[in-house]
């Protein structure tokens, strides 16, 4: 088994016995991300990877709507039109020939850590390099994820207003808010929303994927959406035929803020952060979850430990881009990493290297 990234303030324990020997593959470096940042969203459309967002010191005013497109055929990044309303911690996915963005947080000022959760929805068309706003999502929230199943987009989890809070009050670590287990489904063909059975564990900063017609969610923060909250290793499976959830094998390491993607067989996940009152750190670790066997495989680790980054699978490569190098309480500053690493699935490294 591979060792976790060792933080100056914490050493993480070995993986659970549920982990198995990893499938073949190796990590490879690609063209660096042109606008390093954190808390981004990612989507794959027509064989290209789109990364949206800019949160922290590298963004003007602390938040910007940067959109960059990566073409694996040329190993080049291209700047695209910014989203009209910059957000962070948005849920994002590709569906057919478009990119969809759901919710997220809007900073109230460049110097404040407070933010407003939003329910605004945006659609980006790569063919015209243009954005348009769609009807709102039912629930205002950020830190959720978006997955595609049965020609609809499922937005899961996140954090938003506390039931006793008003919508005109910003959220911070010291202001009442709640992590949600909400599942809302968007139909791009009609613009309509439907609510489904909630997850068993409310969570934000989670990961997930779709395999064989079922949704899987894993990890994330529970309780608060801010640094200092506990991370979970809980994994759940959703069956759309019965609108029910069930528990599956736990992750090897509890954490949040991972990059993730699925190739339709396995769900790949890397990086992330772990923090509570006793420990804080960022992971290099990578794993793959096999729903058919309900097993986790440990993969070789990334070179650069990161969280708040995004991933996508294109032509058998699990790409990961940008992200923060240290935990929010680790003293690393609010900038970002230019690192772009891809796990080449099923191919050993040339010369036996990583």
Residues of each region from the PLM?
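Kelch-like beta-propeller repeat domains
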Residues: 20-354
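N-terminal signal peptide c-region/cleavage motif recognized by signal peptidases
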Residues: 14-17
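Bacterial N-terminal signal peptides that target proteins for export
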Residues: 1-6
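Hydrophobic helical h-region of N-terminal Sec-dependent signal peptides
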Residues: 7-12
């Amino acid at each position: 088994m591979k060792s976790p990234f060792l933080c100056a303030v914490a050493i993480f324990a070995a993986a659970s016995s549920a982990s198995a020997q990893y499938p073949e593959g190796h990590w490879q470096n690609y063209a660096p991300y042109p606008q390093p940042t954190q808390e981004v969203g990612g989507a794959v459309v027509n064989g290209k990877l789109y990364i949206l967002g800019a949160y922290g010191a590298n963004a003007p005013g602390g938040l910007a709507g940067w959109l960059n497109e990566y073409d694996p055929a040329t190993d080049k990044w291209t700047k695209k039109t910014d989203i009209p309303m910059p957000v962070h911690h948005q849920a994002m996915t590709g569906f057919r020939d478009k990119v969809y963005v759901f919710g997220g947080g809007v900073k109230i000022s460049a110097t404040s850590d407070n933010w407003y959760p939003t329910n605004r929805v945006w659609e980006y068309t790569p063919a015209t390099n243009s954005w348009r706003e769609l009807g709102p999502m039912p629930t205002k929230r950020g830190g959720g994820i978006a997955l595609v199943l049965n020609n609809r987009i499922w937005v899961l989890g996140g954090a938003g207003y506390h039931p006793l809070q008003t919508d005109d009050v910003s959220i911070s670590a010291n202001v009442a808010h709640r992590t949600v287990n909400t599942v809302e489904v968007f139909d791009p063909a009609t613009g309509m929303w439907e609510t489904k059975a909630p997850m068993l564990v409310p969570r934000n900063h989670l990961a997930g994927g779709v395999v064989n017609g079922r949704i899987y969610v894993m990890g994330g923060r529970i309780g608060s959406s801010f640094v200092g909250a506990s991370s979970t290793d809980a994994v759940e499976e959703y069956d759309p035929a019965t609108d029910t959830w069930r528990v599956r094998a736990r992750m090897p390491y509890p954490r949040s803020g991972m990059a993730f993607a699925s190739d339709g067989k396995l769900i790949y996940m890397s990086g992330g952060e772990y923090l509570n009152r006793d420990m804080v750190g960022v992971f290099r670790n990578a794993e793959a979850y096999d729903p058919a066997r309900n097993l986790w495989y440990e993969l070789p680790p990334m070179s650069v430990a990161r969280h708040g980054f995004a991933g996508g699978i294109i032509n058998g490569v699990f790409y990961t881009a940008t992200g923060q190098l240290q935990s929010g309480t680790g003293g690393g500053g609010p900038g970002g990493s230019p690192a772009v690493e891809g796990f080449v699935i099923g191919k050993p490294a040339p010369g036996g290297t990583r």
